[in-house]
């Protein structure tokens, strides 16, 4: 019996044994010093990118004006110094309408500050 190879199986293998093509570190600021994490980007055989994200120290839904869902996107520039005036727009090489920019990623769902 032949076993079909699914994209999920390939993605699992990439995460288990692959080397990221790029890595971005997440770190907090004076207002949110508890934030930290890492985002890893892997090439796939499907002409796309697999994004692995791990974030610690997110405010949970007990924090005023917070929820357990956090938007995630990539900006044109990597300068995240306050007040974020040098980050540029969301990465959008095809000039797509929001929320279909290439840099608009799926939301993170946090559980007790971890996503």
Positions of PLM-derived features:
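N-terminal leader/targeting pre-sequences
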Residues: 1-115
């Amino acid at each position: 019996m032949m076993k079909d190879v699914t994209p999920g199986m390939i993605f699992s293998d990439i995460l288990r044994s692959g080397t990221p093509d790029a890595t971005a570190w997440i770190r907090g600021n004076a207002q949110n010093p508890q934030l930290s994490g890492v985002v890893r980007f892997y090439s796939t055989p499907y002409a796309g990118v697999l994004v692995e994200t791990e974030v610690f120290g997110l405010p949970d839904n007990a924090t005023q004006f917070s929820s357990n869902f956090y938007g995630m996107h990539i900006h044109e520039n990597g300068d995240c110094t306050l007040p974020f005036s040098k980050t540029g727009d969301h990465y959008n090489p095809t000039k797509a309408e929001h929320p279909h920019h290439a840099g608009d990623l799926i939301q993170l769902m946090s559980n007790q500050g971890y996503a």
